[in-house]
């Protein structure tokens, strides 16, 4: 079910009977308030302007409110300096101060502390600061970009999102401004860990360990006991990154066991074989400057903002570039990881696993594999034309409305190519799905399943599938999913995986499954970086660089509630579609 992050107050903008207003129809009091102008949600055409009307209804009460930041004399209130610090320090949250006119507002507030501005200038300053603080809180909670522009679609039901204007007003009134920021933070536990890592890596910007390049390796690689001119610099970098407990007191002359252990820690955090040998890949990873890692962490934080935390008591995530599945328990917002395993995802070249979410509804043991028509036409039929014996060797058969056939004839092959027949693989040891699949119905035919080739899980990079997700420990996941059905014991699960015919177990409650894309992850208290195998970080980075509506260049008087609708400026390059949050 699609859902949109709209506060209850805004929903009251829907006319009786739920009819959605068309753009330009009469609305409630206000035109687009400054805090909403240019927001991608407002520019929707697919939903007939209904969502825009809801947001406008939310803006009007805020526009009519008393000044938040200035007292009756036009002087800044106690919370004003803290609000300005949020904007000027936005980089600490992976955001950009220039997006919130931080420098100009900081100067204006400093001037107002020295001398009260005119009433018109005070009104403009208060409105501008309110607009930018709310933009900051909204970006902090929901992200800066339309998810559709980064090829992601998430529809899972979530807990109600905070009404940020109300939260802000109450926080200012109670003298607890920090409550507003806490309410706006994304609910993913991972977010706080990434934010701490971001602050640390930002502190390394001018660290002397990156002041000079590491020299070439002797013989192309460095092993235990060898000498190398870069050892002291290596030790300094590893210490700064947290892999080496403390930097050596004296110059390092040999690659000893302490340094080797630190390198193994570094390698395991950077998706490299943790063998302690420094080769080209490890040297390249060591050469990445902290600023590049800061950007990588910031992109991971942005993706968490764009990804809804499911309200369901249990959910599963697959982090595609990390090749990792995690199963979580959600107890009223307190999220705990129960299970983690390696996975294989779609090939980066041509069969990428899409980024979306869907509910798992049942498990099928000993499944048939109904070969997708595209795979049958491109791969299976050409193979059968060359080697008709391949059908029997792989336990396959032709299926049509008239029945099942195992005859590899030109007529049957032509029927498959024409879409009049399909090929399926019977349950058994050669079945491409292994002996179990976890069904999450979707129009992309993506699901989780086992594999007859478990040896691939030992690879560091694991993008080998046609798009579905192959899981390493299917029994453990089945037990976790069926936890509320005690009759499904481990023995019964394993027995069902060896049947000659499919066996189905329906879930009592749907389990959301989310396909994520995080190249920076905190796992077990350690920050891990993984390669951008699908190039999606570059896509998000490009979207974030798109211009936003320009802030006012000068301080001018404003009307708090405009009397007539004003055009909403479109953000350059943005999509007109609404993506469900």
Regions found by a protein language model. Give the residues of each.
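Well-ordered beta-sheet/strand-loop patches within structured domains
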Residues: 2, 154-162, 169-581
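N-terminal signal peptide c-region/cleavage motif recognized by signal peptidases
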Residues: 59-62
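N-terminal secretory signal peptides that target proteins for export/translocation
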Residues: 1-44
